Structures are given as C-alpha cells and as structure tokens.
C-alpha cells in the first residue's frame, strides 16, 4: 500500500475494538468443594464492575445475586422479600478474570451443583446503579448504558419487600 493510502487510512480515525458477548457475559457450571475457590470465567469484575447471579442446581435454594456496587459478601435473593443479606463465606472477591467464593452453601457446598451467570458492566449491555427512593412516580434514574434500558430490575436492599 502506498504511503498516501496509509496516511488516508490513519487519518480516517481509530476504531474501537469490538466488544464480544464473551467479554461481558459468562455462564459457568461447577461442582462445589466447600473451600475458597476462584471461578475463572474471563470476566473483569475488579476493573469494570458487574453482577454474579448464582443458583444451586440440585436444590430449591434461592438465586443469590452479588454485585460490585454493593460489595463482596452482600447478597439479594430473587425469590424472597428479604432485605440485603450478608454472607461472609459467600462471594469473597471480584477478580480481573472472574471472582472468588468461600465455603457457603449458597455458592460452594461440597458436591452440590451450581450455575452462575456473570454480567460485566458495559455500555449498551449492563449497568448497576444504587439510589435512594423518594416515592416519586416517573422518577428518572441515571445510568451509564448510553441507550434506553431493555430491562430494569429494582429491589430495596434495606427493607423486606418483594421485587416489583
């Protein structure tokens, strides 16, 4: 290619690297071992933030949701009205390539089967925000999606109320 053509291409502007679904989302199936375990799924939760949604597959135990906005050891249960719970042996760390779990029966009980879905914060894909409610209908909640949300989940973390 001629130097002139190279200059034209360079002058056209840089293009961001594409973001693929496996950069921002992971389904991970595992068997519990009841000790601290790193779940390596390639999702950068430490640097980018996100949510880990875990379900024990061989029982009726609730789905556990932990996210970087509320911090490690904090859980919400999608099938319960409970306020935010604390599980000091649940999700222990958000890592640059996944996350670390302890020996909690919600995440890592010996020989129990689990599935986790990890969502990384990314424009036009997923975001987590926290806010204080003020009982105002039609209130706008700021987010970093850069687009209109396709789905919104809301849950009080301080009171026992069902998910709307």
Where are the model-predicted features located?
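Surface-exposed molecular-recognition determinants
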Residues: 2-164
